Amino acid sequence: MERSTNARHSTLSSWTRESNTLSVLSKDVSLEDAKEYWKDCQADGKVDWIFEKLLNKLKILWQKIKDGSATNLEYVRAVILVNEAEQLEEDTETLHTDIQKENKVQENTDCAPERKEDSCADLNSDCETDVSGSECEHEDHSTVSPPATGAVCFGKHLCGPSCLSDINPSLLKKENPLNLPVSCDFQRWRVKTNGSEYPPHILYKAPCGRSLRDSDEVHSYLTETGCHFLGVDNFSFSTQVQLESHLSIKQEIVQDCDISNDVESVPVSLSNEIDDTRPTNFIYRKTSWPPGYSINNFTDIFVKCCSCTDGCLDISTCSCLQLTAQAFEKFTDSSLGIGPLGYKHKRLQEPVPTGLYECNLSCKCDRTLCQNRVVQHGLQLRLQVFKTDTKGWGVRCLDDVDNGTFVCIYAGRILIRTADSSVKTTLEDSVACGNEAKEDNGSTSTLMLSKRKRKPSHSDSEVTVMHLTPYSMRSLGLSVHRQSNTLSLTHLRSGGREISLEPFRRPKTKTSMLQKRRRQLIEEGACTVHNSSEEEGPTPPQSPKQKFNAGRKIHRNENSDETASGYVSEESSSSVISGGHPSEKPTCRTKSKLNKMTPHLSTSPEQTCEEDLHFLDASKEGNVGRFLNHSCCPNLFVQHVFVDTHQKSFPWVAFFTNSVVKAGTELTWDYNYVIGTAPDQEIQCLCGQQTCKHKIV
């Protein structure tokens, strides 16, 4: 009993000290100073935000008082708040006029511009006047998780890990990635300066009150605080991007919350508001299989790696950024003054024709803070596969997406074959077990694939397209070295759709000779390639020597330099690795009439040799990228990115936005089909754009 009495007296003494301190503080603040302070806050548009934050603090304190988990200091503060509330109620009539001018009374103060002196122990208030004379619209469109600390005064500080110590990353849901900072108690304001001709801009407020005006400041803040649950690409400074924009869906006949079955870190939903059909069954793959480095016998996986500590921002020290710049400079006219292209704050504003080299597994840079790791992090946006009115299945975004944002990759099975000048009409079947591929009757002219014909009623998501030049080098003012050998093309195929990738060549090596020998062993029956699981490799055959069925053809003109590629039929079992079986040694070509048709990006302007053709087949295995439709005015562009290997034949095919995309908009890209190239295969384009070319294949 005596201990309880002593403790109660001690607590009452603390209350008295707190009350006395508050009284002294109130005496030091004059009415004129208070009115001037609130005028500044009103002009800066901070009143609403301060009261919203105050309400969050009060709710937490309220809950702690109810469940008995409050600390002694929090009990004291609760009593002080109650006393002040009673006093405020008594003085309401007297101060009504003054309070009405200031709009509302607030508790928190903005952090001072100089914040490099004190430690960051208090995480609540704001007192920064960097947007004085402006109007702010606070964009808090989701439930904010407030700090667990009570309402305490804020002092100048040096930002560090303690600024975000109260954020629990495990509680963050898989939602709009641009909404994650708001869920972590950041505030997003739309700021417009009064009487200024400048347009509105976006301003972020960190939980400790620090203002973040652009992506550079965001990166600095995340680096100083050691934040590993937010990236600079989670922040958008575009006024066109609205965090509260969401897609409103009508009555769904068929729906699926995640067609990836938890393969992707973010669910890929499916919605059909038109009929009761579903997409054809396929195996969902997060990335293409097999990895490029395994096809290359694990040789020359990475040319260089870095050990940056600044987030890989300095091209003079980052080896990976230098690889991108060096490849780009080989095809750039230095007199044009075009600087190296690449990621800027984890966004890509325009395509890099020579490819991007991301930091790899051998690099020692921080995976979260590194600005040169984007595609390898996988799908981050909330995408939905939906049934369109006229084009079959398509893909749309469920939230606003900023310009230059990575959307997804095009994943599938990598198929290999050899284009041998001695083989005029046949190709090795992709299945070693002897599955017959249906022979295709149609043929095309030089450099065109022999494709099976499609009815005009088929959707864009099912059409076949030949994509010769994914990037317009002329639009970038580049001087392109045309490749002499153009027999080999790399293609993507989704259903019946094929996408040509610009090939990257290098001279024949010992590795390629070993690969040739392996293919000969497969042909002779010494080993086979199965397509049952990812872990399986070449295994001894169960039967004697088998011949491969020639279900696909290379069509060759009379000119030996002009060779056409064969089309892998959708009905064939084409979801495994397949190789060629050359009967004579490939020859290097330095001149070809095909140069006039297709500009190629090569690793060097010197002579190049024929190598294997690599096909990315998404007909039976793939990801959400296989559902992307064509548009003559697309909102996506294609970019080659080297992630798991620097071998030129195996880039990842990534899609990035070329503008701000609003929630519910279908995501499309241009197949780049040149009208008249394959007139027999052309069908009507249904993109509906004003610049529509009316024909695709």
Swiss-Prot record:
<dbReference type="Pfam" id="PF05033">
    <property type="entry name" value="Pre-SET"/>
</dbReference>
<dbReference type="GO" id="GO:0032259">
    <property type="term" value="P:methylation"/>
</dbReference>
<keyword id="KW-0132">Cell division</keyword>
<feature type="region of interest" description="Disordered">
    <location>
        <begin position="438"/>
        <end position="461"/>
    </location>
</feature>
<dbReference type="GO" id="GO:0070986">
    <property type="term" value="P:left/right axis specification"/>
</dbReference>
<dbReference type="InterPro" id="IPR047232">
    <property type="entry name" value="SETDB1/2-like_MBD"/>
</dbReference>
<feature type="binding site">
    <location>
        <position position="308"/>
    </location>
    <ligand>
        <name>Zn(2+) 1</name>
    </ligand>
</feature>
<protein>
    <recommendedName>
        <fullName>Histone-lysine N-methyltransferase SETDB2</fullName>
        <ecNumber>2.1.1.366</ecNumber>
    </recommendedName>
</protein>
<dbReference type="GO" id="GO:0003677">
    <property type="term" value="F:DNA binding"/>
</dbReference>
<dbReference type="GO" id="GO:0008270">
    <property type="term" value="F:zinc ion binding"/>
</dbReference>
<dbReference type="InterPro" id="IPR007728">
    <property type="entry name" value="Pre-SET_dom"/>
</dbReference>
<keyword id="KW-0217">Developmental protein</keyword>
<dbReference type="GO" id="GO:0000278">
    <property type="term" value="P:mitotic cell cycle"/>
</dbReference>
<dbReference type="GO" id="GO:0001947">
    <property type="term" value="P:heart looping"/>
</dbReference>
<keyword id="KW-0862">Zinc</keyword>
<keyword id="KW-0131">Cell cycle</keyword>
<keyword id="KW-0158">Chromosome</keyword>
<dbReference type="GO" id="GO:0005694">
    <property type="term" value="C:chromosome"/>
</dbReference>
<feature type="binding site">
    <location>
        <position position="306"/>
    </location>
    <ligand>
        <name>Zn(2+) 1</name>
    </ligand>
</feature>
<comment type="similarity">
    <text>Belongs to the class V-like SAM-binding methyltransferase superfamily.</text>
</comment>
<dbReference type="GO" id="GO:0007059">
    <property type="term" value="P:chromosome segregation"/>
</dbReference>
<feature type="binding site">
    <location>
        <position position="312"/>
    </location>
    <ligand>
        <name>Zn(2+) 1</name>
    </ligand>
</feature>
<keyword id="KW-0539">Nucleus</keyword>
<dbReference type="InterPro" id="IPR051516">
    <property type="entry name" value="SETDB_methyltransferase"/>
</dbReference>
<feature type="binding site">
    <location>
        <begin position="629"/>
        <end position="630"/>
    </location>
    <ligand>
        <name>S-adenosyl-L-methionine</name>
    </ligand>
</feature>
<feature type="binding site">
    <location>
        <position position="365"/>
    </location>
    <ligand>
        <name>Zn(2+) 3</name>
    </ligand>
</feature>
<keyword id="KW-0949">S-adenosyl-L-methionine</keyword>
<feature type="binding site">
    <location>
        <position position="306"/>
    </location>
    <ligand>
        <name>Zn(2+) 2</name>
    </ligand>
</feature>
<feature type="domain" description="Pre-SET">
    <location>
        <begin position="304"/>
        <end position="378"/>
    </location>
</feature>
<dbReference type="GO" id="GO:0005634">
    <property type="term" value="C:nucleus"/>
</dbReference>
<feature type="binding site">
    <location>
        <position position="626"/>
    </location>
    <ligand>
        <name>S-adenosyl-L-methionine</name>
    </ligand>
</feature>
<feature type="binding site">
    <location>
        <position position="318"/>
    </location>
    <ligand>
        <name>Zn(2+) 1</name>
    </ligand>
</feature>
<feature type="binding site">
    <location>
        <begin position="391"/>
        <end position="393"/>
    </location>
    <ligand>
        <name>S-adenosyl-L-methionine</name>
    </ligand>
</feature>
<dbReference type="InterPro" id="IPR001739">
    <property type="entry name" value="Methyl_CpG_DNA-bd"/>
</dbReference>
<feature type="compositionally biased region" description="Low complexity">
    <location>
        <begin position="565"/>
        <end position="581"/>
    </location>
</feature>
<dbReference type="GO" id="GO:0046974">
    <property type="term" value="F:histone H3K9 methyltransferase activity"/>
</dbReference>
<feature type="binding site">
    <location>
        <position position="359"/>
    </location>
    <ligand>
        <name>Zn(2+) 3</name>
    </ligand>
</feature>
<feature type="binding site">
    <location>
        <position position="685"/>
    </location>
    <ligand>
        <name>Zn(2+) 4</name>
    </ligand>
</feature>
<keyword id="KW-0489">Methyltransferase</keyword>
<feature type="domain" description="MBD">
    <location>
        <begin position="172"/>
        <end position="242"/>
    </location>
</feature>
<dbReference type="GO" id="GO:0051301">
    <property type="term" value="P:cell division"/>
</dbReference>
<feature type="domain" description="SET">
    <location>
        <begin position="381"/>
        <end position="672"/>
    </location>
</feature>
